[in-house]
A protein has these predicted regions:
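Long, terminal "pre-/pro-" and other extracytoplasmic accessory regions
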Residues: 1-276
Length: 276
């Protein structure tokens, strides 16, 4: 091959490389676009807010729920008593503020959560278990859709949204205010996954002297899978809405802890177990 021929061969190769480098990517992109454009495609995406749900243990779930509802939502009996004691003690109560939210779940149950149709049966099953454990007396009546309202809530750690607990709140309907409340559940918080009862207020025929708080908290802790609690002395007994109570403390999340109170309202014969 002559020197001139080799020169033209090299020049042709260079031109070819430059042409491919410029035209090649554009041609490849057009080829790929043909398989995408003007054709319907289906892509499965997660709904907003429907992310990975972190599996918390029983103590962590109790702690998150307690932080969310501790001072935001009070039972009818506690609201009345709190108003009375606050007025007499000259105390000013404000709603709990911070990085925890307790919000109604308007989109309803998801996944394996207990449904609207199942919650009344689930609550009655929970009451049956509490009676068997002697946490509640046998004469507490079952709930039903005609007399009770069931509302689904999410208790959320705003800074760590994966830390959330979904619960049903079961409460005696406002239309039942003038009804006989003896031996009836007033309200309760029920886990939307396993149906366990976190907190309850119930009218009974018991008196404070009939109630063994240590036995109740031991049985309830075992039922919830919480481990053994420690006794807790209230920093300020005046903040309580009844003189009849005993407090216990459970490990929470991180350095946090959950206070569980077993108490009693004299006059209306109402026993309660609340978390805070």
């Amino acid at each position: 091959m002559t020197k001139t021929a080799r020169y033209f061969t090299v020049l042709l190769t260079v031109v070819l490389v430059i042409t491919v480098s410029i035209w090649g990517p554009e041609a490849l992109a057009k080829y790929k676009d043909k398989g995408i454009l003007n054709k319907p495609h289906i892509e499965v995406v997660m709904e907003a807010g429907e992310g990975y749900r972190y599996q918390m243990n029983a103590n962590e779930k109790l702690y998150i729920l307690a932080r969310c509802i501790g001072s935001q939502v009070l039972s009818e009996s506690e609201q009345n008593a709190l108003t009375f004691y606050a007025g007499n003690a000259g105390l000013d109560y404000e709603d709990l503020e911070g990085s925890y939210a307790f919000v109604r779940k308007y989109n309803g149950p998801s996944g394996k959560e207990i449904t609207d149709e199942q919650i009344y049966t689930t609550c009655n099953e929970g009451l049956r278990v509490l009676k068997e454990l002697n946490i509640l007396p046998q004469n507490v009546n079952d709930v039903n859709a005609a007399s009770y309202n069931a509302t689904l809530y999410s208790a959320i750690d705003v800074l760590e949204p994966r830390n959330n607990v979904v619960v049903w709140k079961m409460e005696l309907s406002n239309s039942q205010k003038n009804a006989d409340k003896e031996n009836r559940l007033i309200d309760a918080y029920i886990d939307a996954d396993d149906g366990k009862i976190y907190e309850f207020y119930a009218r009974t025929s018991l008196f404070w002297g009939d109630i063994d708080t240590d036995a109740i908290i031991e049985a309830w802790a075992d039922y919830m899978g919480l481990g053994t609690p420690s006794a807790y002395e209230s920093d300020n007994p005046l903040l309580e809405t009844t003189p009849y109570f005993k407090k216990y403390v459970f490990p929470g999340m991180g350095e946090g802890r959950t206070i569980v109170t077993v108490g009693y309202y004299e006059g209306i014969n109402e026993i309660f177990l609340k978390i805070s």
